[in-house]
């Protein structure tokens, strides 16, 4: 068996009448014997263990599921076990019913290659009705409103009307009425605040106008006022005469009053303190002590 280069090449067939050497032998997965190409099947070499791993699957007519029959078990027992535990008749429609195009009058079966999903209505159609006008597409869904508070009020009002008609829904009626009451009170308080602000502004403007008119009526024609006293005069000449009589003497007396600094050593008088300091430093050696 084999050659000098490959002494273990090839094996003899296990069938007694054959015993043929095969360089590519087959090993049976049931009896683990080696056979040639002619006797590789179970029936050709009459394998005694052929039925041990036999696989038989039956399709259930109720649920369209596969039921595997066990080799060492009665098929009736296996079938009863499936019917009492795993059988689901609702699965039959899912498996056997083929998906078709939803357009009325179209009987096209939808498969992997001819199915198109519409972006607007998100439904699957065949290639013939893939465009919106062909399958009467309703268009994209409208976006929700950007005012959730208003929608909440409308929903609460609808809920309240429904609760009035149906006395059993007392809980939803209470929540909707509470929300509506809160919104109404918030609106009324805002309106009251705006009304108060408008009233206060009007009163302030009226008071300012009244003050201006009162001051002008009290002063009459006295438009010239003295800068040194609160006296008022009708003409500039009267104001000048008042200043000369009442405030001229005070200005002259203030001018006649002159501060004099006296040297403590020589009793020399100086009007400017700087001159006194220079005199002391120059004539008395920088000291003012006697």
Curated annotation (Swiss-Prot):
Protein name: Zinc finger AN1 and C2H2 domain-containing stress-associated protein 16
Keyword set, alphabetical order: Metal-binding, Repeat, Stress response, Zinc, Zinc-finger
Binding site for Zn(2+) 4: 118, 121, 135, 137
Stretches annotated zinc finger (AN1-type): 7-55, 95-145
GO molecular-function terms, A-Z: zinc ion binding
Gene name tied to this protein: SAP16
Pfam families referenced in this protein's UniProt entry, alphabetically: zf-AN1, zf-C2H2_ZFAND2
Amino-acid positions noted as binding Zn(2+) 3 in the UniProt annotation, renumbered to this chain: 101, 106, 126, 129
Originating organism: Oryza sativa subsp. japonica (Rice)
């Amino acid at each position: 068996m084999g050659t000098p280069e490959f002494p273990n090449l090839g094996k003899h067939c296990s069938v007694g009448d054959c015993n043929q050497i095969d360089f590519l032998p087959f090993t049976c997965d049931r009896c683990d014997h080696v056979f040639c190409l002619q006797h590789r099947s179970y029936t050709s070499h009459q394998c005694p263990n052929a039925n041990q791993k036999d696989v038989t699957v039956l399709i259930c007519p109720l649920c369209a599921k596969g039921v595997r029959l066990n080799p060492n078990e009665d098929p009736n027992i296996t079938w009863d076990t499936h019917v009492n535990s795993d059988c689901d008749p609702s699965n039959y429609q899912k498996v056997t019913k083929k998906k078709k195009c939803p357009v009325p009058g179209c009987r096209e079966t939808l498969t992997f290659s001819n199915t198109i999903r519409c972006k607007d209505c998100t439904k699957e159609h065949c290639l013939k009705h893939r465009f919106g006008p062909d399958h009467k597409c309703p268009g994209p869904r409208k976006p929700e409103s950007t005012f959730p508070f208003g929608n909440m009020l409308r929903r609460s009002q609808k809920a309240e009307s429904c609760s009035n008609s149906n006395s059993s829904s007392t809980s939803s009626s209470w929540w909707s009425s509470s929300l509506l009451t809160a919104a109404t009170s918030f609106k009324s308080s805002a309106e009251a605040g705006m009304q108060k602000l408008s009233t206060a502004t009007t009163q302030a403007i009226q008071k300012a106008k009244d003050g201006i008119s009162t001051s002008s009526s009290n002063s009459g024609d006295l438009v010239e006022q003295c800068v040194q006293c609160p006296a008022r005069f009708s003409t500039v000449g009267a104001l000048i005469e008042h200043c000369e009589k009442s405030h001229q003497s005070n200005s002259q007396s203030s001018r006649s009053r002159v501060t004099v600094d006296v040297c403590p050593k020589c009793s020399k008088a100086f009007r400017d303190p700087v001159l006194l300091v220079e005199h002391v430093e120059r004539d008395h050696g920088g000291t003012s002590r006697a």
